[in-house]
Amino acid sequence: MKTIIAYHAVTERPLLPGQVILMDAEHQNGVGRRVAEKLPLVERIYRNPAAYRADGLEHHTAVTLRELAMEEVRRAKYPQYPSRMACLYVSRTLEEAEKWADFFARIGRPTYAVVKLEITGRCFIGDAERCFPGSPDRVENIRLAEKYWAYPQNGSGNAAVCEMLADGEIRVLETVKEINANL
């Protein structure tokens, strides 16, 4: 495992310097927890997709449909990458993390700070614009998930909105910027 430095826009709960976060199959993130809560509904949707309209799905239900497709494709074709349901979403640069923090604060999400991290684990840099609203059409969800994971890993940073997924041992090195919005 290689060690890298990255940054994170802290939402949901504060992170403190020296704190260690473990992200792996046994330690899911908020996405993973929300997906688990929606599994019974997803099973009903996939048993009878004609009874549901994509534009009528509640936000977290659409996200769950997307994330389950993302995980299915990752496990089958890209197991070397972190799971979106057991990772920390981080940024390669302070500037990227500040943009995410500003975005989260603007949409009303509790946003505490931007922190600098030391990550010993796996990373995947993807194009956040390739995230899609999940739909009752499982085949289409899988097709779109394949496009997300196939994003070229050339490090050129050519994606308009990068998202970096990191798992493993993640240590908070310092708080770089206090935000404290929508708390």
Predicted features along the sequence, with ranges:
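A short acidic-Thr-Gly-centered motif at the start of a beta-strand
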Residues: 79-81
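Active-site-proximal specificity loops/subdomain of glycosyltransferases
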Residues: 59-77
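Conserved NAD+-utilizing ADP-ribose enzyme module
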Residues: 2-5, 11-62, 84-86, 95-113, ...
